[in-house]
Amino acid sequence: MKNTILILFTAFIALLGFFGMSAEADPIADPIADPISGPNAEADPEAINLKAIAALAKKLFG
């Protein structure tokens, strides 16, 4: 059961990375953007929240 959940979780993260994270959408990759400011969550509401994903994985897998 745990292996199945781990495989599904890994596949989900891979799909998010494949479809959601491209160089064009990355504010850090923009040379015109202010280098001091980090990624703006308000500018990209569909941005992946890695901290929330890590917390969920930690909660699921102990």
UniProtKB/Swiss-Prot annotation:
It comes from the Eukaryota. Belongs to the MCD family. Mastoparan subfamily. Expressed by the venom gland. It comes from Vespa affinis (Lesser banded hornet). One of its GO terms (biological process) is innate immune response. Residues 26-47 form a propeptide. One of its GO terms (molecular function) is toxin activity. The modification Phenylalanine amide is found at F61. One of its GO terms (cellular component) is extracellular region. The keyword Ion transport does not apply. Pfam families: Mastoparan. Antimicrobial and mast cell degranulating peptide. Has broad spectrum antibacterial activity against both Gram-positive and Gram-negative bacteria (S.aureus MIC=16-32 ug/ml, S.xylosus MIC=1.5 ug/ml, S.alactolyticus MIC=8 ug/ml, C.koseri MIC=4 ug/ml, E.coli MIC=4-32 ug/ml, K.pneumoniae MIC=32 ug/ml, P.aerugiosa MIC=96 ug/ml, S.choleraesuis MIC=16 ug/ml, S.typhimurium MIC=32 ug/ml, V.parahamelytics MIC=16 ug/ml). Is also active on multi-antibiotic resistant hemolytic E.coli O157:H7. Acts by affecting membrane permeability. This is Mastoparan-AF. Residues 1-25 form the signal peptide. It is found in: Secreted; Target cell membrane. The keyword 4Fe-4S does not apply. AXPX repeats lie at residues 25-28, 29-32, 33-36, 43-46. Its main location: secreted. Keywords: Amidation, Antibiotic, Antimicrobial, G-protein coupled receptor impairing toxin, Immunity, Innate immunity, Mast cell degranulation, Membrane, Repeat, Secreted, Signal, Target cell membrane, Target membrane, Toxin.
